[in-house]
Amino acid sequence: MTEAECIALKQQAFRKYFHSLNEQQQQAVFSVNGPVLVLAGAGSGKTTAIISRIVNMIYFGDGYAQADGYLPEEDAVWLQAYIDGKEPEDVERLREILAIAPIRPWNILAITFTNKAAGEMRARLASTLGEELASSVHASTFHSACVQILRRSIERLGYGSDFAIYDADDSRKLMKSCLADCNVSEKQFPPRGIVQEISNAKDA
C-alpha cells in the first residue's frame, strides 16, 4: 500500500468507529487540538458529539489528523475487514493501530451548566468508556468545577479551603447583618439592591 492509501484506510476506520455521527459531528470529534464551536438546536446531537470527542481523545488522541503512512500488512488486512464488517469491533486493537498521543482522562474537563446535564454526561461516558475511565474525567457543572479548583488551590491566595458558598438568600441575610452593624437603614439601602449592585460590579 502507498502512504496515501494507508492514511486513507486509517481515517476510514475512524469514520467506521464513529459511524453513528453525521459528517459535521465527526468533524468536531476528530478536531482534537484547539477550540471547536458547535452551534445547533436542542436535541440535535451536541452532547453526543461532545461525548464522542472525549472518547476519541482518550482512545485515539490525535490519530485521525496525524495518521501516518506506516501500516503493517497484517494490520491493514484487519482494518479493511473491520471496515467491511467482516471483523467484530475490537477497541483495543483499533487503539493499537490508530492511537497517536492519547489524552489521559484526568486531563479532560467537561463543563456544563446544570446538575442534570452533568449527570447525563457522566452516565453516557460510563456507558462508552466503562466506569473506571469515565470516573477519571472531570465532568461537572461550571460552579462545581470552580469550587473544586478553589478547594484545592485557594491557599495560594492566602485564604482557607473551608469557605462557604452563599446563595441569594444567604447573601441578603449577610447584607442585612452588615447594615445593622453599621447602623444603616434598610429603607435607605435595601439589602437586595446592594447585593445586586455588588453582583453587577463583579460582572462589569
Regions found by a protein language model. Give the residues of each.
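P-loop NTPase Walker
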Residues: 1-160, 165
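ATP-hydrolysis module of ASCE/P-loop NTPase motor domains
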Residues: 28, 113, 133-137, 154-204
